[in-house]
Each structure stands twice: as structure tokens, then as C-alpha cells.
Amino acid sequence: MVATVVNVQVKNEEKIETAPKKVVFDTKNLNLWYGEDHALKDINLSIHENEVTAIIGPSGCGKSTYLKTLNRMVELVPIVRTTGVIEYRERNIFDKSYPVEELRTHVGMVFQKPNPFPKSIYENVTYGPKIHGIRDKKTLDEIVEKSLRGAAIWDELKDRLHDNAYGLSGGQQQRLCIARCLAIEPDVILMDEPTSALDPISTLKVEELIQELKKDFSIVIVTHNMQQAARISDKTAFFLSGEVVEYTDTNKLFTTPSDKRTEDYITGRFG
């Protein structure tokens, strides 16, 4: 079975034998309900370090719900309940002895719509470090420069650090939000449709940034854009009706999917 997807180009990479990468998140038999709505069903999925893992699927399939479960943001909805296990670095994130604040220092998040605080660029980046007790001006200055460089936006903003973040373009705001995430030195970055509100040029910059960031971070990205998933990810999971239909190397999923439902989705027969 060979899927032909219009305008989707997968990365052409040579196969090089390397040691297996460590598992960052190991999800085992995860089920989640919103009240009576069974939103995630028996999810089993391992996410590896220094890779970009894309999650694709039609609207309402559970992509964003799963993403927000990885840092327990989903618990902000009072009617949520879960069964199963998600291990982060071999520690169950649902364990009552695991403070959610600690988890979120390791697992940062970038949202669909850029959401800078109504503060200066400098204050946006230093917000997280200050919450964690860093007050030294020299240290904060270093964090700001390192984070903005990490988000590939230092040269654009270095002379505007005390300007209000609302004065930035949409693409700049999103990269500022990525810098704000980097400032707390996370291990994993979750991205929920990070380019859906951006123009093509800004989207390209964010995609290029993601490729750089995976050298130091593990990235999980939810996207409706299959072309984007094919361009930037190492592995892709296809969700449908709250289930993982297929999870494999991105090249394989987009060229030789093993499940007919995957082929039907990526070739546009539904979605």
C-alpha cells in the first residue's frame, strides 16, 4: 500500500544506525473522560528525546487533549478524570507526590495563538525565572539574551527589550513566547498548533527554529497541517476518535502507512 499525498513532501534522510534514544514520555493505557465523554482511549505511545513528534488527526480526535495531559494542564477542566500511566523520565506524572509545578518546569508549552503578557519583552522572558526565585539582574540579563537567541529573535529585539510585547508582529510574538518557554530551561516543549495563526514567512521561521531546538529539547507538536508534520517531524502519531491509529517514523507514515484509515486521512478522503 502506497499513499499518494498531494503536495506533501517528506524529509529524505539517509538511514544511519544510531543508539536508541531515551524515552522522555511513556504513555501506558491512558484513558481520559470529560464527564461522560470518553476523549482518549487506551493510548500507548513513547516519545523520545531530541526528536520532533507530530500528532495529526481531524478536529476533535483528541490531539490537543493528549498534549495537555503531558503537563497536566488538562486538569484545569474540573470534570476530567483519567486512568492509566504517563511516565516522564520514568516517574508517573499522576503520582500525588509529584508536584504539578515541578512537572511544568520540565515541560513547557507554546499555544496556538501567541499570548505574550501585557508587559515589556524583557519582563515576558524573565517572568518564569523570577517566579522560581531568580532576582539577580546580571543573571536575568543573561537569561533574556540566551532565551531570545535560542528563539532566533535576539537580533530583532535586542534594542527593544523594554518595549511592550504587544507591539510585535504575530510571528515575533510567537517566537517571544517560545523564548519565554526556554527561559525556564525545560526538557520538553509542547506546541499546540504554533503556526496556525501566522503568515507563511513567520511559519517558515518557526519551523526552522523547531529544527534547531530539537538539538537540545524534545518537542511534541500538534498540527492540522500534514505538510508541516511531514517537513519537520521525526515521528508522527495519527489520532482518530480518541485512539492512536498509527505511530511510526514520519517518512513511513506518509509513504507506506500500515492502516487503511491512515491512508484515507493523509490522502484527503476524510478530515
UniProtKB/Swiss-Prot annotation:
It is found in: Cell membrane. CDD domains: ABC_PstB_phosphate_transporter. Residues 25-266 form the ABC transporter domain. SMART domains: AAA. The keyword Lipid biosynthesis does not apply. The keyword Repeat does not apply. Gene3D superfamilies: P-loop containing nucleotide triphosphate hydrolases (3.40.50.300). It catalyses: phosphate(out) + ATP + H2O = ADP + 2 phosphate(in) + H(+). Keywords: ATP-binding, Cell membrane, Membrane, Nucleotide-binding, Phosphate transport, Translocase, Transport. Its main location: membrane. Part of the ABC transporter complex PstSACB involved in phosphate import. Responsible for energy coupling to the transport system. The complex is composed of two ATP-binding proteins (PstB), two transmembrane proteins (PstC and PstA) and a solute-binding protein (PstS). Belongs to the ABC transporter superfamily. Phosphate importer (TC 3.A.1.7) family. This is Phosphate import ATP-binding protein PstB. The lineage of its organism: Bacteria, Bacillati, Bacillota, Bacilli, Bacillales. The gene is pstB.
